[in-house]
Regions:
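Conserved small/polar residues in nucleotide/adenosyl-binding loops
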Residues: 703-706
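Low-acidity, Ser/Thr- and Arg-rich intrinsically disordered low-complexity segments
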Residues: 672-689, 694-701
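Glycoside hydrolase catalytic-domain context in secreted enzymes
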Residues: 1-663, 667-669, 675-678
Length: 706
């Protein structure tokens, strides 16, 4: 940020009265016409496309994007989202529309850690691994904000700082207790990277308390860690109405004035909600100083200046027009992202891909076969066209193949029609299966039953999941259809891990499509018939039930995620198949011993031994040999996505930065010396292996020079 921007912000704020300053700290900020400051609504969403503001390109949900492991793709998507946001903002502003969701401060990405598969909002995240989350979060932020240090294309926001991942039902009163080790090893890592590597403009505080302090008013989180330790220079915004929780649910204050003052005094600059309507009263009572308020407003003015909202400080992006919204190129990128996000979990005897010449009749069965909700997740925009799996198969196969359809059952209820008897669509599904050559079962969830408290419709769990089984009658429907004896392909639509133990044993192929975006059905159909090879990898662990998981409210990382669990799992983190095989050899490093401040370069030859072009995700894992017992086992520390043509070999280089060798031994982050094992893998050889199966293994020693 330039000195000019900082001085301009100070000049603007110095001319404001105390009431005017406070007015700018509310998410609905009024105009100050005498200073040339237009009205502005800070609340805008862009989790996987511009959301809630009309037509936009709807990309796969964040968890699906995470399955690509591809930072270049995610940054490109962020840039497209920002371009569409700019196009909308520019035209809305010309027409005097400054309403909610029409601005440029996007409250995304969500870089919380998906530590427990029951969390309803996990599909908003990039999965369970801090390294992957940090990499992808930074990529999306760079795409949204652009590369001009003094002119923001849009402003990103890393949320929810910092220890936040359910339960949804008690988020307004819950105290998440986390050890210093888990804080720095897991919960803070991605936020730190977003601040230091991507220069994220905003950070949103969470609803819950963290070790006794409400996150939106925590001196430890917002001042000691975020600003002093991480060097954050942007603004902090509260989650919506979270500051009221201070006195209403957390009981750390007695009045709304005390709550507003606590938030500002500890580093919260902007209030999504109503608490700061009482900030003047808090000021009059001496609970908060003019200096604290001024500092907050200066930070808010800095971002508005950098976004080009002041007439004396124009934006280089102000000529982007509405024509870019959902244009052909953007739609094509969304479909490509859907293709890249699909994870092939099972392919018995290379059953897939199908040969369309051999399929005369195909049955598409299940509550998600023709569901738009199963395409889009939450925090979505409006697409001008949706393509469900049913529609994708119909369009792909044309008139030459008959496509039969049956809903089979409701997503979670025992009947589809209210006056009917239970299982009212079962028999139709069985008839369709009997008449087909192959069956595509489209099962899973959607954001009406896994999502955010207050948004998701499952009032029994406030958006969270009670277990990992398919809901309602879906499992029973799957078993009944499979019993017909026709080949079955299961296409899963969900934003989280599902226990597919029965399906793993009994169906021919399984594809996880996540929530693949508005036109994701096109990608599903193309994958089934071999137009491309699926290449996605799981960004989460698929467990066999929840019986061996810790309590949902337990924020210790012990026995959680691939980094700390010792349990047998159904599909491990990083797992995903191709059509055909890729093989690795020639693993080497540029040095067997290195100074702690030096990067290490790792090389491996990767060969595509198939007739399909593949986007191979090369994964590098590190394990510290002499690590403390509370340290993770193997953990992801390197990713390289390489496109390989049929039968092509490429030499791939992965660079491990010095910090990737660090262990968290609070308050230090370095051991004086250690030996680390490096493993490079495409995917575990078998779904039930706990650590990605290494092609080969190398030890690397490094020394910490004091």
């Amino acid at each position: 940020m330039s000195k000019k921007t900082i001085e301009y912000a100070k000049k603007l704020v110095s001319q404001m009265t105390i009431d005017e300053k406070i007015s700018q700290m509310l998410y609905e900020s009024p105009a100050i016409e005498r200073l040339g400051i237009p009205e502005y609504n800070w609340w805008n969403e862009a989790l996987h496309g511009v959301a809630r503001a009309g037509v936009a390109t709807v990309f796969p949900q964040a968890i699906g994007l995470a399955a690509t492991f591809d930072t270049d793709l995610i940054e490109k998507i962020g840039d497209v989202v920002s371009t569409e946001g700019r196009g909308k903002f520019n035209e809305f502003s010309k027409k005097g529309d400054h309403g909610i969701y029409k601005g440029l401060t996007f409250w995304a990405p969500n870089v919380n850690i998906f530590r427990d598969p029951r969390w309803g909002r996990g599909h908003e995240t990039y999965g369970e691994d801090p390294y992957l989350t940090g990499k992808l979060g930074c990529a999306y932020i760079r795409g949204l904000q652009g590369d001009d240090p003094d002119h923001l294309k849009s402003a990103a926001c890393a949320k929810h700082f910092a220890v936040h991942s359910g339960p949804e039902a008690i988020r307004h009163e819950f105290d998440a207790k986390a050890s210093k080790h888990d804080m720095y090893d897991t919960y803070l890592y991605a936020f730190k990277r977003c601040v230091k590597d991507a220069k994220v403009e905003a950070v949103m505080g969470a609803y819950n308390r963290v070790n006794g302090e409400p996150a939106c008013g925590s001196r430890t989180l917002l001042k000691d860690i975020l600003r002093d330790e991480f060097g954050f220079e942007g603004h902090v915004v509260s989650d919506c109405w979270a500051i009221l929780d201070f006195h209403e649910h957390h009981h750390v204050t007695d009045t709304v004035e005390e709550s507003a003052a606590m938030a500002v005094n500890n580093g919260c600059d902007l209030n999504c909600g109503s608490a700061f309507l009482h900030l003047k009263d808090a000021y009059d009572k001496g609970l908060v100083s003019d200096e604290a308020i001024t500092a907050a407003v200066e930070r808010l003015m800095e971002v508005r200046i950098r976004l080009g909202m002041m007439k004396d400080y124009p934006s280089p992006y102000e000529d982007i027009s509405y024509e870019v919204v959902e244009c052909k190129e953007h739609v094509e990128l969304s479909v490509e992202a859907a293709r890249r996000s699909l994870v092939l979990l099972k392919n018995k005897d290379n059953f897939l891909p199908l040969d369309r010449k051999n399929v005369k009749t195909i049955a598409v069965i299940g509550p998600n076969a023709n569901s738009r909700d199963a395409l889009i997740g939450n925090y979505y925009g409006t697409s001008s066209r949706y393509i469900t799996p049913l529609e994708g198969l119909q369009q792909y196969l044309g008139e030459d193949t008959r496509v039969l359809y049956a809903e089979g059952c409701h997503l979670y209820k025992d009947k589809v029609q209210g006056l009917a008897e239970e299982k009212d669509r079962f028999k139709e599904a069985l008839i369709m299966a009997e008449q087909s050559d192959v069956v595509v079962m489209c099962l899973g969830l959607d954001a009406t039953i896994e999502g955010e408290e207050g948004d998701a419709g499952n009032e029994y769990a406030s958006g969270d999941k009670l277990g990992l089984m398919l809901p309602g009658l879906q499992e029973e429907l799957l078993e009944a259809v499979a019993a017909v004896g026709k080949p079955v392909i299961l296409v899963l639509s969900a934003g989280s891990a599902i226990d597919l133990s029965w399906a793993e044993e009994h169906v021919d192929a399984i594809i996880d499509s996540w929530y693949p975006g508005a036109r994701g059905g096109k990608a599903v159909a193309e994958a089934i018939f071999g137009e491309y090879s699926p290449s996605g990898k799981l960004p989460v662990t698929f467990y066999q039930g929840t019986e061996n998981l810790p309590e949902f409210t337990d924020y210790s990382m012990a026995h959680r995620t691939y980094r700390y669990t010792n349990e047998n799992v159904l599909y491990p983190f990083g797992y995903g198949l191709h059509y055909g095989e890729t093989n690795y050899d020639g693993l080497s490093v540029d040095k067997a011993e290195s100074d702690v401040n030096e990067p290490v370069e790792v090389f491996v030859n990767v060969t595509n031994d198939s007739r399909y072009t593949v986007n191979e995700i090369v994964q590098l894992y590190i394990r510290h040999v002499d690590a403390a017992e509370y340290e993770p086992g193997y953990q992801l520390k390197g990713i390289e996505v390489v496109k390989l043509e049929p039968y092509e070999t490429k030499k791939v280089k992965l660079t491990i930065s010095p910090r990737d060798f660090q262990e968290v031994v609070y308050p230090s982050f370095l051991l004086s010396a250690a030996t680390s094992l490096l493993r490079i893998t495409s995917s575990p050889v078998t779904p039930d292996c706990m650590v990605p199966q290494a092609v080969s293994c190398i030890s690397v020693s490094y020394t910490h020079l004091r």
